[in-house]
């Protein structure tokens, strides 16, 4: 990968210098912070405090923590980090810019901050930066969808389908991978209806394949969802017809949260995610990515945490010139 970076405008980071700045306080960022702290690196974690899974009541598939509320998992992780004096967490703080520098003392980056908490400096200088900001998501424009999201409507089959198995389920989406997601969800139920909400997300060949598998494809536009206290009970179509369901999944449109990296020439894929090698190195030396900020795979906390731990090990090895693939 290229070693090039663009030098940006000067930002005063005097007095605040660390080995690594981690942008993002989710499972990838916190896991990396723990492992970097244990490697005696000085670390700052910048956490805006807006996790994508904030609406989720229970997280699943995390070994020893199956069913834990995601906010509780973050609380436990933060308590563990408190034991490492070389790790600091800047709460309610956003990164407004990531700039390269040619400092003689090895500080290759300046991370400009916008903090709402007390004692947040305007910037931090760092030898390396790990981007673990995850994704932003946009849900289909269904009025009451948010009322059920994270309770009986979910986005991750691997995370939440077990609790919905053998029920009448909906899959709602407007993206071209909807048929593939339907085939995945069908592992857990034989009563699945795919709602394209008036879009052409499922083509005629895919519809025939899904129908042959017992999956119903409903192309009419959705008016709204029905239910009480987060428990969805029906999809109401624009013509007034109701399709009763007992839960379901939605396919959001995901967008990388990377507005702050525009000053660096970081390679992106066609979806705007950061391109990395298998160890989390981006196209700019000293900048790494973990979790969904890089090309996303399974949307699970344990996967993101594992990627953060691997990136931490690679950062430590790279800092002493020990090249490793990990």
Question: Where on the chain are the PLM-derived regions?
Answer:
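Beta1-alpha1 glycine-rich phosphate/pyrophosphate-binding loop at the start
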Residues: 18-72, 167-168, 177-200
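Residue-level detector of alpha-helix initiation sites
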Residues: 26-27, 137, 176-177, 294-295
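A Rossmann-like FAD-binding core segment of flavoenzymes
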Residues: 5-6, 75-126, 189-273, 320-326
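FAD-site-proximal beta/loop scaffold in flavoenzymes
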Residues: 7-9, 147-163, 252-298, 302-303, ...
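Short, well-ordered coil/turn residues at beta-beta hairpins
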Residues: 24, 126-128, 132-134, 139-141, ...
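FAD-binding core/adjacent interface of flavoenzyme oxidoreductases
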Residues: 2-20, 89-167, 274-278, 282
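N-terminal glycine-rich dinucleotide-binding loop that anchors FAD/FMN and/or NAD(P) in oxidoreductases
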Residues: 42, 48-50, 57-84, 155-156, ...
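N-terminal FAD cofactor-binding segment of flavoenzymes
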Residues: 27-42, 73-77, 84, 133, ...
